[in-house]
Regions:
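Conserved small/polar residues in nucleotide/adenosyl-binding loops
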Residues: 1-4
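Short, surface-exposed linear motifs at loops/turns and structural transition points
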Residues: 21-135
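Hydrophobic core positions of the immunoglobulin-like beta-sandwich fold
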Residues: 101-102, 230, 290, 300
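Cytochrome P450 core scaffold surrounding the K-helix E-X-X-R motif
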Residues: 149-158, 311-324
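Active-site microenvironments of metalloenzymes and redox enzymes
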Residues: 151, 165-272, 316-320, 373-374
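Short, well-ordered junction/capping motifs at the entry into regular secondary structure
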Residues: 224, 276-304, 331, 355
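Disulfide-stabilized, aromatic/cysteine-rich ligand-recognition loop
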Residues: 294-296, 331-374
Length: 374
């Protein structure tokens, strides 16, 4: 694919140089179209205009066609024209141009390319394959971008505020993982009655607040607790569930970005509101079914309160001091894992608040959700 596109661009430039850059019959010349970002209903594409050609560019932008199958085949390209779907963008001078195309269909493959038309005709750049992603009932799409992580007025371990950039978009669970979901996971993986795998306990069934038990043949959920968030799960048990789902626990930065409504950047103290009680259960005597409070700007529930949530990162109170700007993964080692969001038995905890527990901890106040990177 790369060889084809490089050859395509080279031939275009070679043709231009062969005919002469001042030739009145010269078409514009552009680089191959590249894909910068995509999601369920949009994509962002980019191309560079090298030459305007022998006359002014009168029409320009991007055009696209869809491909009905998601099977990847380098040779099965589609070449859109201005007779197909078009979104116009003024392209006048040699420069890098980026365009966002909205209104695409989820879970569909498109082929997109830039075009530029002058008096001599239309030049088309080499197309790029755009596989839009699915829309899920139980997951929320979080588009990649930048945000300011941490707090300038919080606790010491929330400082300093620093810019984080994600080079990937991701999906995150709309709700905290439930007892029913975790019970099904244990049974499908034929986990033993002690819920221990390779020496790591996944869930503490002996804790009286645990809503799962083993009846001698399989794991079962206690009556009325199916839709409550699963608790008494260790970090190992939470991460195992995430991996089975094709994902991971959220990194600390992914968690805070999603809680802050991603690119909407709501900037509220809690996940979707400046008032804790609108979006989260705090100072309560028991946990609650997910989705009973207001969601944040992305439609994610209970990132403030109900149960606190495991994150993937090791904890350090100095993690922010030398954190990488792009896709931070946290410290390489440690003794405790990050916990975020606060729990129903606590006073309100802001979305920048940080806590930590040993990964073997099976707390009645800690649950989790899943992140699937794109």
């Amino acid at each position: 694919y790369k060889r084809q596109s490089i050859l395509f661009t080279f031939l275009a430039l070679a043709t231009c140089l062969w005919t002469g850059c001042n030739d009145d019959e010269e078409l514009p010349a552009m680089s191959r179209t590249s894909l910068k970002s995509y999601g369920p209903t949009f994509c962002e594409v980019q191309s560079r205009l090298y030459l305007t050609g022998g006359s002014d560019i009168k029409r320009s932008g991007a055009c696209w066609v869809l491909k009905s199958t998601k099977e990847y085949d380098e040779k099965a390209l589609e070449f859109a024209t201005v007779e197909d779907n078009v979104q116009e963008l003024p392209i006048n001078n040699p420069d890098l141009y980026r365009m966002r195309i909205e209104g695409l269909q989820p879970d569909t493959v498109y082929y997109v390319r830039f075009f530029a038309t002058n008096d001599e005709g239309t030049f088309y750049s080499y197309p790029v394959r755009v596989p839009t992603t699915k829309i899920y009932n139980d997951k929320v799409f979080v588009e990649m971008g930048k945000f300011m992580m941490g707090s300038a007025a919080g606790k010491v371990d929330e400082m300093p505020m620093h810019e984080v950039e994600f080079e990937h978009s991701f999906y995150i669970s709309k709700n905290e993982i439930t007892n029913a979901e975790y019970c099904e996971f244990l049974n499908e993986n034929e986990v033993g009655a002690d819920a221990t795998v390779n020496g790591d306990q996944w869930i503490n069934l002996e804790d009286p607040t645990c809503q799962l038990s083993h009846d001698g043949s399989k794991f079962v959920v206690k009556a009325g607790a199916d839709q409550l968030p699963v608790v008494c799960v260790t970090w190992f048990g939470a991460q195992a569930f995430c991996e089975e789902s094709g994902g991971n626990l959220p990194t600390e930065s992914e968690w805070e970005f999603a809680a802050n409504s991603g690119l909407l950047k709501m900037g509220t103290a809690y996940a979707g509101s400046a008032t804790a009680s609108e979006v989260g259960w705090f100072n309560e005597s028991a946990l609650h079914q997910g989705g009973m409070k207001k969601a944040n700007g992305l439609g994610i529930f209970d990132m403030s309160g109900n149960v606190a949530e495991w994150c993937h990162d090791w904890y350090s109170d100095k993690a922010y001091e030398d954190a990488p700007e792009k896709d931070p993964q946290g410290p390489k080692s440690g003794s405790k894992k990050v916990v975020r969001g606060g729990a129903y038995n606590q006073a309100p905890v802001t979305i920048t608040g940080r806590d930590a527990q040993q990964p073997t901890t099976a707390s009645p106040y800690i649950g989790f959700r899943v992140v699937n990177k794109i």
